């Protein structure tokens, strides 16, 4: 079967004057039609997952930001607490050092006051003892004088002893120097001469036969008289001069 023929109308474009301009304006004014592209279910799932992940990431980031802020605040508080602790420790140390210095000052003052009191108490005792010390020193001086007097006495005694010896010594000197001269007198006692003594000592042989031994008186007469002291010799010499 043949198809029916359609009625065709011939259109003259020349009738329209602004055909080219209209096309240009139309192309400028109306852009291409926007068509929505249908996304596949996989892409939708991926988008959903990415959205969830982005939300989770944002939440995590927010949590992290909050935590960091909290940490910063805690660290700031900790630093402040540490600073306060350090300040307290320093204050305690300073207070302890001040207390120790005050105690030392108090002890030094107490010791100084005690020493002053002891010095004040010792001052009158020293004043009292000063006189006794002077007396003791005077006694020492007396002792020294006594010792010096003893030495002087010893020296005087030593000097006096040789004087006594000198007094005793002249007697033997006089004995040695004084030689009594033979006295010529009748009844005076004197040293016999050598001739007389020889005659008396050498008797004749006849007399020896006739006479017995000579009595002891003759022997005594023949012996020289004992030596007299210088004074006695001087006394004997005086009467000899008178004769």
From Swiss-Prot:
The UniProt record lists the keyword Nucleotide-binding: no
Gene Ontology cellular component list: chromatin; cytoplasm; nucleolus; nucleoplasm; nucleus
Residue numbers of Phosphotyrosine PTMs: 13, 26
Bias (Basic and acidic residues): 64-77, 197-206
Modified residues (Phosphothreonine): 179, 202
Annotated region described as Disordered, given as residue ranges: 1-243
Keyword DNA damage annotated: yes
Superkingdom, natural source: Eukaryota
Gene Ontology annotations of biological process type: cellular response to X-ray; chromatin organization; double-strand break repair via homologous recombination; gene conversion; interstrand cross-link repair; intracellular glucose homeostasis; modulation by host of viral genome replication; positive regulation by host of viral genome replication
A GO molecular-function annotation: single-stranded DNA binding
PTM section of the record: Phosphorylated in an ATM-dependent manner in response to DNA damage. Phosphorylated by CDK1 and casein kinase.
Residue(s) carrying Phosphoserine: 14, 19, 54, 58, 61, 73, 75, 79, 113, 130, 132, 144, 181, 204, 214, 223, 229, 234, 240
Sorted UniProt keywords: Chromosome, DNA damage, DNA repair, Nucleus, Phosphoprotein
Sequence ranges of Low complexity compositional bias: 91-100
Biased composition (Basic residues): 35-51, 149-174
Compartmental location: Nucleus; Chromosome
Compositional bias annotation for Acidic residues: 111-124, 132-145, 232-243
Tissue specificity comment: Widely expressed, with highest levels in thyroid gland, prostate and uterus and in fetal liver, thymus and lung.
PANTHER family: NUCLEAR UBIQUITOUS CASEIN AND CYCLIN-DEPENDENT KINASE SUBSTRATE 1, RAD51/NUKS-INTERACTING PROTEIN
Assembly and binders: Does not interact with RAD51.
Function: Chromatin-associated protein involved in DNA repair by promoting homologous recombination (HR). Binds double-stranded DNA (dsDNA) and secondary DNA structures, such as D-loop structures, but with less affinity than RAD51AP1.
Protein name: Nuclear ubiquitous casein and cyclin-dependent kinase substrate 1
